[in-house]
């Protein structure tokens, strides 16, 4: 981390550490952990760190990351595994849900230890989050919200983020050629997500088999 860049970090009091996979998941994750560790121990950075875990990374590296990051995330990206395989045959949901499990166990074990020992190390005290890509594959809003609801049933999952698919690859026919990201749909999903998290709505109270997608012209709470 360059000193000038670190100065900018201090001004913002928070940062997001992320990377595409280089060589393999563990190699990439090890480098992310090293940056987070240096920020804490060498540069004495006490601000907020959100570290995006790499799917397929080892439990040991995820556990180490949680000692330096306030929040960890592993992105689901595509809700249905068959659609994930269609776009990225080398990926599967196991590589995503395994690190999620490691994070959950680390957070819960840390809380238990800190109840017994005041100075026990914290582990990702802000919990974990994930992201779903909207519009790249055939999932309905109902499919996406059922996944979100299941994830919120896990005690350490704090947020599911929704990101409208942006078409940047026109030659790959597996991907839809959208003229613009589905921003209205993305916004409706966030509104429905709010109902799930804060008002304890059930998914089938928002969408159902007859109407599996949120109405673009009306907010979910009014539909």
Model-derived regions, located:
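Conserved alpha/beta core segments of nucleic-acid transaction machinery
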Residues: 209-223
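Auxiliary alpha/beta "docking" domains used to position bulky ligands
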Residues: 20
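Short, flexible active-site-proximal loops enriched in glycine and acidic residues
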Residues: 11-16
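Conserved AdoMet/S-adenosylmethionine-binding subsite of the radical SAM
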Residues: 23-207
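Single conserved hydrophobic/aromatic residue that forms the stacking wall/gate
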Residues: 1-10
């Amino acid at each position: 981390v360059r000193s000038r860049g670190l100065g900018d970090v201090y001004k913002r009091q928070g940062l997001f550490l992320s990377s595409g996979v280089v060589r393999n998941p563990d190699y990439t994750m090890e480098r992310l952990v090293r940056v987070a560790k240096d920020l804490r121990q060498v540069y004495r950075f006490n601000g907020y760190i959100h570290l995006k875990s790499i799917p397929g990374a080892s439990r040991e590296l995820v556990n180490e990351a949680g000692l330096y990051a306030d929040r960890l995330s592993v992105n689901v990206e595509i809700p249905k595994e068959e659609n994930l395989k269609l776009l990225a045959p080398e990926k599967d949901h196991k590589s995503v849900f395994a690190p999620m499990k490691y994070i959950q166990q680390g957070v819960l074990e840390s809380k238990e230890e800190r109840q017994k020992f005041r100075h026990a190390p914290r582990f990702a005290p802000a919990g974990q989050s994930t992201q779903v890509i909207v519009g790249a594959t055939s999932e309905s809003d109902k499919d996406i919200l059922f996944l979100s609801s299941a994830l919120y049933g896990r005690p350490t999952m704090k947020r599911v983020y929704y990101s409208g698919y942006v078409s940047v690859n026109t030659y790959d026919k597996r991907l839809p050629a959208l003229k613009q990201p589905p921003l209205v749909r993305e916004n409706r999903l966030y509104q429905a997500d709010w109902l799930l998290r804060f008002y304890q709505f059930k998914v089938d109270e928002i969408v159902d088999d007859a109407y599996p997608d949120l109405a673009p012209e009306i907010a979910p709470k009014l539909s």
